[in-house]
UniProtKB/Swiss-Prot annotation:
Glycyl lysine isopeptide (Lys-Gly) (interchain with G-Cter in ubiquitin) crosslink location in chain: 175
Protein name: Sestrin-2
Domain notes: The N-terminal domain has an alkylhydroperoxide reductase activity. The C-terminal domain mediates interaction with GATOR2 through which it regulates TORC1 signaling.
A GO CC annotation given for this chain: nucleus
Length: 480
């Protein structure tokens, strides 16, 4: 424990230095500032060119959204800048993001930020860990807790198991895990507290996916460098503009790729209109095939395994525990989660509304905002119905978490999602800390960056909903 304390203490200032409103050393030296000046302005993302998002001042984003709380700290953070490329979604996101962290609720404010630290640390997401460390201290949290889980109260430490499962293998959550947290005792959780904690955990796990998926960089350095400005909000008629949606891949070849995708989408939509029925057995067979093929969708073997940082390990129990494919060769797979047996609309939403009424409606609005978001454009084309493509992405994310929709033809996934996109989706959803710039660049090379951010919004929400469904189903079974 002494080693863990010393390692965490040494790293703590470094992370707080990059957090909004953070504390730490006086800032980098003159040599570092000169080097940064030579490089020019740094954007909010390592993947997206700075000129793609820095269009207008931060005030334009706040004015467009009408969110005073966003600017309460006097700055717009990098995550908001990138996500703000889609301000209609960001409005719903911010309401839910703000609610469990800052409004009245069963958990103390400092506890909420500590739970967020625990969640983000599972994916080694230093961006979120640093941000919530600063917020933890600003809300009166005990600095000793930041030396590691062993310094936190036993009640918080009891969340480690369900945090681990929600982050990596939510299908393993059972009513016994819920019972262990709620059973009468000295460090017991109330049901209201647990629901808020589960929303926080799943929110921060999925937000870690967005941070890694979009290459979000730390905020302005501690020497007072200004925070990035916000992007221009898109019009309702078109997707947020890029200088050249084909600039990464060579115009004619990319145009052919887009046209081929458009043709596949058109054929699928026509077959749906003709109601060309597929038997239930065939639908189930196609799901099992897609689930099995997902075993082969993995990052390149030359991707180095990220080395866990000591400051992250302070907040993580069983760090070797990670995502494993829902269906593994030679292993007994858990039963498939049939979405019709426990849906968000009919079961999860009503349970959340009953136990956490402030959050249920906002969660539902956020899921719908991401799923239905469209500008009716693809790359250089406008007037496009993208519903089948968005549905394929959403359902593929749920597929890798073992969730099947009986009324969905999983053959559409293979028709619409190229392999590079599948690799990216699975990496960002399941082990986001392995995401690389190359993965980001390889998929949809002919699409706008804002469209790639849109994919990450679908990833964020589909992943969060999948984990919540497993947790809420376990609570329902515990209560019945």
């Amino acid at each position: 424990m002494i080693v863990a304390d010393s390692e965490c203490r040494a790293e703590l200032k470094d992370y707080l230095r990059f957090a909004p409103g953070g504390v730490g050393d006086s800032g980098p030296g003159e040599e570092q500032r000169e080097s940064r000046a030579r490089r020019g302005p740094r954007g909010p993302s390592a993947f997206i060119p700075v000129e793609e998002v820095l269009r207008e001042g931060a005030e334009s984003l706040e004015q467009h959204l009408g969110l005073e709380a966003l600017m309460s700290s006097g700055r717009v953070d990098n995550l908001a800048v990138v996500m703000g490329l889609h301000p209609d979604y960001f409005t719903s996101f911010w309401r839910l993001h703000y609610l469990p962290l800052h409004t009245d609720g069963p958990l103390a404010s400092s506890w909420r930020h500590y739970i967020a630290i625990m969640a983000a640390a599972r994916h080694q997401c230093s961006y979120l860990v640093g941000s919530h460390m600063a917020e933890f201290l600003q809300t009166g949290g005990d600095p000793e807790w930041l030396l590691g889980l062993h310094r936190a109260p036993e009640k918080l430490r009891k969340l480690s198991e369900i945090n681990k499962l929600l982050a990596h293998r939510p299908w393993l959550i059972t009513k016994e895990h819920i019972q262990a947290l709620l059973k009468t005792g000295e460090h017991t959780w109330s049901l209201a507290e647990l629901i808020q904690a589960l929303v926080l955990l799943t929110h921060c796990h999925s937000l870690s996916s967005f941070v890694f998926g979009c290459g979000i960089l730390p905020e302005g350095d501690a020497d007072g460098s200004p925070a990035p400005q916000a992007p221009t909000p898109p019009s309702e008629q078109s997707s947020p503009p890029s200088r050249d949606p084909l600039n990464n891949s060579g115009g004619f070849e990319s145009a052919r790729d887009v046209e081929a995708l458009m043709e596949r989408m058109r054929q699928l939509q026509e077959s749906l209109l003709r109601d060309e029925g597929t038997s239930q057995e065939e639908m189930e067979s196609r799901f099992e095939l897609e689930k099995s093929e997902s075993l082969l969708v993995t990052p390149s073997a030359d991707i180095l395994e990220p080395s866990p940082h000591p400051d992250m390990l302070c907040f993580v129990e069983d760090p070797a525990f990670g995502y494993e494919d829902f269906t593994r060769r030679g292993a007994q797979a858990p039963p498939t989660f049939r979405a019709q047996d426990y849906t968000w609309e009919d079961h999860g939403y009503s349970l959340i509304q009953r136990l956490y009424p402030e959050g249920g409606q906002l969660l539902d609005e956020k899921f719908q905002a991401a799923y239905s978001l469209t500008y009716n454009t693809i790359a250089m084309l406008s007037g496009v119905d993208t519903s089948v493509l968005r549905r394929a992405i959403w359902n593929y994310i749920h597929c890798v978490f073992g969730i099947r929709y009986d009324d969905y033809d999983y053959g559409e996934v293979n028709q619409l999602l190229e392999r590079n996109l599948k690799v990216y989706i699975k990496t960002v959803a399941c082990y986001p800390e392995k995401t690389t710039r190359r993965m980001y660049n390889l998929f949809w090379r002919h699409f706008r960056h804002s469209e790639k951010v849109h994919v990450n919004l679908l990833l964020l929400e589909a992943r969060m909903q999948a984990a919540l469904l497993y947790a809420l189903r376990a609570i329902t079974r515990y209560m019945t």
